[in-house]
Amino acid sequence: MKEEEKTRLVIVQGPTASGKSALALELAERIGGEIVNADSMQVYRGMDIGTAKPSQEERRRVPHHLYDIVDPKVNFTAADFREHASRAIADIERRGKRVILVGGTGLYIRILTQGLVASPGGDDNIRRELEDQAHGEGLESLHRRLAAVDPVAAARLHPNDGVRIVRALEVFLLTGRPLSAFQEAHRFADEPYRCLKLGITVERELLYRRVEERVDRMIAEGLVEEVRGLLSAGYPATLKAMGSIGYREICAHLAGEFSLDEAMRLIKQNTRQYAKRQMTWFRRDSEIIWVEYPGKFDSILSTVMGFYH
């Protein structure tokens, strides 16, 4: 497909608490756009406060897509996201509107815009053995094992990212080839969209202060009650969705493992670390145009309008 024939996407990305949702909303109102979520946690129904979803008032201002689309018990994957997002984008374009993709899950954005890696299927027995090792010896042992056979993948993954560490080892044990080799061979060649990537840059101390304020606000708005309600409704702490930042710490607090103050301290600490990992991911993408928001909105709007014209 020729470049000029591709659907145009404005992508707003950056670390958590950087102001992505606010920028996406302001842009959508100014350019006749609709917002598509690219946050791996905001797809889940009933997980609202801890994922910092847009409010109902904000959603009434412009149409929002891919929020509250699956039950927390569903293991929603990057491939699932690509399928849902592709359909939403096609629908928005068909109605003559502009698409604004917003979120901090870099993998989702990359797979949507650059294609899926053709890697082998899974093996339940191998996965269970790896999960048993993680449970018995700790994730650090799995990460060291991965580093020995696929140092490229190990360097990309946080030592606590159990799901992806297990997957990378599973691929190696099934095929004898590192997962990074499959990714290198693929090189994410299929690019169906023409993209303008905007990244919000925030000075570190300001970002960390926003993180602290956001966590305090989540607790004040009822995060503990939200988690308690999910647990009571039959969503156990062992679910993948319930293991995300904010939910896992409150689950542990409700189980009597530590105080609410300690849970809040851990949420803030883990969120800061997550924001740092997000920035590391996004900084590797040379196509991102880094912008200041809200201070330089007029300049951002000018860049976006130039992209369409």
Curated annotation (Swiss-Prot):
Residues 39-42 are annotated as: Interaction with substrate tRNA. The record marks T105, R127 as: Interaction with substrate tRNA. Pfam families: IPPT. Its EC number is 2.5.1.75. One of its GO terms (biological process) is tRNA modification. The keyword Nucleotide-binding applies. PANTHER family: TRNA DIMETHYLALLYLTRANSFERASE (PTHR11088:SF60). This is tRNA dimethylallyltransferase. It comes from Geobacter metallireducens (strain ATCC 53774 / DSM 7210 / GS-15).
